[in-house]
Amino acid sequence: MYHDNTTEHFLKLGLQSSLKNIGIYRKIVDKIQHIDTYNLKCNDYEWKFKCYNRTRFEKIRNLFRIDLNSYIQSLCDQNMITGKIYPKSGSKFWRTYDNKYIVKTITKKECKFLRSILKRYSNHIKDNTYLVKIFGIYRITLSNFDSRFIIMNNIFQYEINIENIFDLKGTTEERYANEQSIELKDINF
């Protein structure tokens, strides 16, 4: 796997190309899911960046009054802050320098599921929702590296006093953490 800084670099270049609708090559691969594919080149690397259902996510960002330029600025202008890696799921998290957004790696299965519910999700989500706000699904493919990402709102973007953090999964199986743990689980809740 590539170093975090390299992954972040390719993610930023792909985001800039797809969000600004530029790139060496763009085509809609699937008319139902609307996958925009960009063949990009950076130094000696040739790689693909996929943006899933661009127009639907544009509508979601517009619903939450997210200006495209400020979105790109948050994600691309400065280095992201590397977060935690969750060993069980293998997910890696970053947050933007301004704390507005979280970037999370997702599995192929999670990507497929999110894409399958995207139409219903976008029709259901409202301005005052308690659902996580997903603003984009992306994929980087580079020789032997393949990773998928979602970008979502950071619910902790403002300084607040948090007494407990829970990792809730909606099940009780293996879902108890020692009270001294940093993250508590479903049974602790």
Language-model features: locations:
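Polybasic, positively charged surfaces/segments
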Residues: 1-189
